[in-house]
Amino acid sequence: MVKSSFISIISQEDKKENKGSVEFQIVSFTNKIRRLTSHLELHRKDYLSQRGLRKILGKRQRLLSYLAKKNGVRYKELISQLNIRESKTR
């Protein structure tokens, strides 16, 4: 996806770019995760990229749990738009 489409997904009623918002960070982490996953399918022994992927997954998980605590409705909407699974602990 393109960065402008991420911004439109996040804040359709808000027309300004808010790159510090939790939703924007989750979307950008999801984009990085998808790129790293496709990279690791070709390069299975790239252990530094695997480590980076695990770190980004942890950051995204922490942000998702924060968003779920603060606003459950936005959490559900974001998960459905990004086609990612809901957290097991929720």
UniProtKB/Swiss-Prot annotation:
<dbReference type="GO" id="GO:0009507">
    <property type="term" value="C:chloroplast"/>
</dbReference>
<keyword id="KW-0934">Plastid</keyword>
<dbReference type="InterPro" id="IPR000589">
    <property type="entry name" value="Ribosomal_uS15"/>
</dbReference>
<dbReference type="GO" id="GO:0005840">
    <property type="term" value="C:ribosome"/>
</dbReference>
<dbReference type="InterPro" id="IPR009068">
    <property type="entry name" value="uS15_NS1_RNA-bd_sf"/>
</dbReference>
<keyword id="KW-0687">Ribonucleoprotein</keyword>
<keyword id="KW-0150">Chloroplast</keyword>
<comment type="subunit">
    <text>Part of the 30S ribosomal subunit.</text>
</comment>
<keyword id="KW-0689">Ribosomal protein</keyword>
<dbReference type="GO" id="GO:1990904">
    <property type="term" value="C:ribonucleoprotein complex"/>
</dbReference>
<dbReference type="GO" id="GO:0003735">
    <property type="term" value="F:structural constituent of ribosome"/>
</dbReference>
<protein>
    <recommendedName>
        <fullName>Small ribosomal subunit protein uS15c</fullName>
    </recommendedName>
</protein>
<dbReference type="InterPro" id="IPR005290">
    <property type="entry name" value="Ribosomal_uS15_bac-type"/>
</dbReference>
<dbReference type="GO" id="GO:0006412">
    <property type="term" value="P:translation"/>
</dbReference>
<comment type="similarity">
    <text>Belongs to the universal ribosomal protein uS15 family.</text>
</comment>
<dbReference type="Pfam" id="PF00312">
    <property type="entry name" value="Ribosomal_S15"/>
</dbReference>
